[in-house]
Amino acid sequence: MLSQRQLFLDHLGQTSDFPLMLEIERARGVYMYSAEGKRYLDLISGIGVSNVGHRHPKVLQAIQDQLDHYLHLMVYGELVQSPQVQLAEALAKTLPDPLNACFLVNSGSEAIEGALKLAKRYTERPNLVSCLNAYHGSSHGALSVSGSEQFKQGYRPLLPGVSHIRFNHPEDFTHINEQTAAVVVETVQGEAGVQVADDSYFQVLREHCDKVGALLILDEIQAGFGRTGTFWAFEPYGVVPDILVAAKGMGGGMPIGAFIASPEIMQVLKNNPILGHITTFGGHPVSAAASLATLHVIQEEKLLEQVSDKARLITERLQHPAIRGIRQRGLMMAVEFESFDILKPVIDRAIELGVLTDWFLYCDNAMRVAPPLTIQ
């Protein structure tokens, strides 16, 4: 009989020639357990997903409660489904006005696609601007606004009318003009290795977008839902985006995403044509119930208030001559080494010792540290 690992290689589409190949049987809290019974401390939260830990009891209960009522009923946007309505209302309460219209989808890439369409439809403009070294997803449009040619070159031609500027370089804003529908920016650049903007960057960007009439889309797929110590990473910057994108940590381990805007902007998807953006499974009631429970856990267990102390404790312990520095916002950290050749054995040894971490897509000399917010 073939092993699970061999069946994994034989029958599942692969993403690289070197998957981790850990066979995980169960998970709880900050730990995952292999089929052989080995325990792994999850320091990456499934790449920013398990913000409240694996299988949080309140998330599980919300899922079970929804299973007892219904699963999929109808394509998104037709029936009044309580999990969707309650989640959208709760999200609006975490956000400043006028961000109180929420379109639910299945993932971060889908949320980016919806946000790009919304911006083009609302402004009736053709062009988009994003940042070099940005990662917004793997679908066609999301890949187009991502900022690494290495990952795009095999799939061209991509969307026309997309240009890229440097992150945290306001002098590049001259590329944002009256033909720009939107500027899409990660509030914290994730796959570039946790690149954090200067305090004034987003304020200047907001002012420039207003000046030329371009929308500002902030991508908080990785940085949102408490990861940085505030519920939304943009809060300390004193700006409000026109469109906000969320996913990953939003679902407590279930697949869900959202793009959020003002009712004025969101309403353009309703007509000319009708059904301007549709999804069969977006906002699935089980995922929506899990997301609402996740939001409540973050608030009720006061996880935001704990992020700073936990981050400080981790950074205090990450002291070693091989570590060149640590970039961070809350529990979103990049531990920098001189090179990938030095970092890779560290990651391999950590996994051998039962600690799961990895490196970043565009920054392979930095170790990703982004544990569940529930870590003690």
Can you annotate each of these PLM segments?
Residues 1-376:
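Conserved N-terminal phosphate-binding loop of PLP-dependent enzymes in the Aspartate aminotransferase
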